[in-house]
Amino acid sequence: MRFTLSLMTCSLLSCFGASSPEPVQVGSAVPAVTCNDQTGQAVDVAKEGAKGLLLVYFYPKADTPGCTKQGCSLRDSWAELGKLGVKVFGVSTDSEADQKAFKEKYKLPFALLADKNKEVCKAFGVSTTLGYASRTAFLFRDGKCIWVDPKSSTSDQASVVLSFLESQTK
């Protein structure tokens, strides 16, 4: 009986594309991966994160309640993040068109990466379930990971990041 249940569980996870890659950890380099943003422009994530601060946050689906709160949290704290020189990329498995509509609807001031093939998720070790990225956030300084939020908050995303950065200056 246990064998049958185990076999069924593995089969279901395989069919629905659940994956659990090894995640980026504090001290890791920014993964070398390129992905199109909401305009179709290719973004070299490692190049963008080589100097200064880069926040890369993953969310399951554009224009859904939790993901909207997360993006708007960062938008609403954009001035504070900007003073600290934080660049931001939001990443989901949505299409470029969906990312563009999400960005425009909520006036998000940062790029949204359309990771349709899940290459960015794989490079960062972010798991996907049923094709959706797990909510996770990474902060890099000069090409190295300095902070990971494995469950990444929604409405408090910006305040959590800002609190971490403030703790680093004390």
Walk through the language-model features, giving the residues of each.
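Structural microenvironment flanking redox-active thiols in thiol-disulfide oxidoreductases
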Residues: 68-106, 118-120
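Short active-site neighborhood of thiol/selenol oxidoreductases, capturing the structured segment around
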Residues: 47-68, 74
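Short, internal strand/loop/helix patches
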Residues: 35, 89, 102-135
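A short beta-strand-turn-helix
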Residues: 33-53
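Thiol-/selenol-based redox modules, centered on thioredoxin-like
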Residues: 133-170
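N-proximal helix/coil linker or "cap" segments that precede and/or mark the start of modular domains
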Residues: 5-6, 10-34
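Short, small/polar residue-rich loop motifs at catalytic or cofactor-binding pockets
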Residues: 29, 53, 132-134
